[in-house]
Amino acid sequence: MWIFGPPLAFTVVYYLVSLKVNGFTRDFDFAYHQELVRGWRPAVYPTVDVFLPVCGEPIEVLHNTWTHVRQLADRYPGRCVPFVLDDGASPELAAMARDFGFRYGTRENRGWFKKAGNLHYGFGQSDGKYILILDADFTPRSDLLEELLPYMEADERIGIVQSPQYFRVLDSQNWIERGAGAVQELFYRSVQVSRQGSDGAICVGSCAIYRRAALDTNGGTTLIEHSEDVHTGFDLRGLGWDLKYVPVALSTGVCPDTAGAFFNQQYRWCSGSMSLLGSKKFWEAPIRFSSRLCYMSGFFYYIHTALFTFVAPLVPIVLLLTSPEMLQVKHLVWVLPSIVYTAMIFPMWHKAPYRLEAWSARMMYGWAHVFAIWDILRKQRMGWQPTGSKGAKKNKTRRFWLGMWIWSGGTAVIWVGAAVYRLFTGYPPDFALVLSSGLFYALVVARALIQPKEHHAEVRPQELQTVGDTA
């Protein structure tokens, strides 16, 4: 059993860091938020540019988003200019932008620094005091600006105000969409709020307002081919600007609906964050220790999920095959608290339904993290693709499926088979729990292996929460 010592030691370190960062922190002061928003009535409202970067996303998704952006711009009392930044140079999108009354632009050096280069182009072609960035699949509430700009106007040291990326979980969605939406709630509802107290909330790009003066000090968005949002937020913090996280659901997004799109999204998020860990600037930036610890907690999370994609099924299998006496009923007292938390408390805490598909989504993103970290170590990172683009849905996922079928599927069979064998050859109550756990693990694997049928459902306008709801 000594072989599990290093990963378990890492787990202890990771949990201690997470406890330091996330434990015993203040909750979001929603009463103060309401007071601040109600009291913001400037004589002259600041100018705002709304950047809408696009790169091959379905036109029906864009039409849905732009409809809500038009409502946002019409509601705002000041000058609000939606600006379509098209890296696909689509004549259809240019015409649709004109129909909506939006500015439209496409750069000559398309592909240069991917999305970061596209945003950099928009930065140089606009002049609003503030910039709202919305990804192609995020529909904003019409009052988004009035909910976030008061923070900017109240504190001139704030460079970014970030709101959650909120996803609805509906029965009409396929299981990948439901699972992908459910697993995001913990980060935006709890983790980001806790990190805000340590000045360590991260920028996630979409659904955020940027101060142009802050971006000026950085030369615009950070030029990098992946995760420019995380890097831009970190770089601005290093330049002395603050980031404010406001956990109020002001926009809603569309989750990936295929394994390829979900794998691509999770791979991109992991590789972007982990690239920061390996950069010289992360260790040299003049930021608070508590802020750096928040980023470290995120790095440890990705490493932990990748590591335990392999370790988690091995522990019960090794115990069943080599040390069945350690699974006696009298030892259950040590694992019951963890089982109760995992099976009951954690799912019940979520507002979104946290069902089998959420656990399958967790298994899938574990493999995405495995390959992202592996590719970083061998310096062969996959190219960037937008989550909702056609390319993302055709993403090469052969190694992901090999991992799912051979490792996850294989360990599920061995786990259940070994537990059944011990059940019939030993004292049944000793092995009932490990068999039940193995059956659940097998169900999670089976759910991930049975993919939903592709469909082309009509994109419906997103239902958004009321002003009083927090993420």
Show the residue positions of the predicted features.
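Catalytic donor-sugar/metal-binding loop of nucleotide-sugar-dependent glycosyltransferases
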Residues: 224, 233-251
